[in-house]
Amino acid sequence: MNLLIDTHVLLWWLDDHPTLSQKAKDAIADGKKLVFISAVVIWEIRIKQKLGKLEIPNNFRKVLDSQPFEQLDITVEHAHAVGDLPTHHCDPFDRMLVAQTKVEHLTLVTRDIRLKKYKIPIIEA
């Protein structure tokens, strides 16, 4: 199954951070699966950067573009799916990732175990 990676997973992957689990690293590097980055992940990163909660390098876009990731835009169908989710979790970025995981039949790579309540496929990061 193809993958959708959460914000912290993307940042850990790009930084080769030891916090990222070997299982997650292997799944992302597999080469047999498509790995998607949602527009909501970039949106969250840029908001946190603007608020001073996150530092990203000046060449972040170039570094990201050099990765073999597919872009996943936010669609009207995704937005409707967010509205259909139970309120197990209130973070709007995570809720969109859950909706996209469901609609697009993906596996979410995340460290956030609260998202398991949505009964979606997850690889723990």
Q: What would you call each of these model-derived segments?
A:
Residues 1-37, 50-62, 104, 113-117:
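Short, well-structured N-terminal submotif of metal-dependent ribonuclease cores
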Residues 7-8, 45, 75, 82, ...:
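Generic structural signal for small/hydrophobic residues in well-ordered secondary structure
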Residues 9, 41-42, 78, 97, ...:
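Alpha-helix capping/helix-boundary segments
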Residues 61-88:
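Acidic catalytic patch
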Residues 93:
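Acidic donor-binding loop at a coil-to-helix junction in glycosyltransferase catalytic cores
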Residues 98-125:
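Acidic, PIN/NYN-like endoribonuclease modules and their adjacent C-terminal/linker elements
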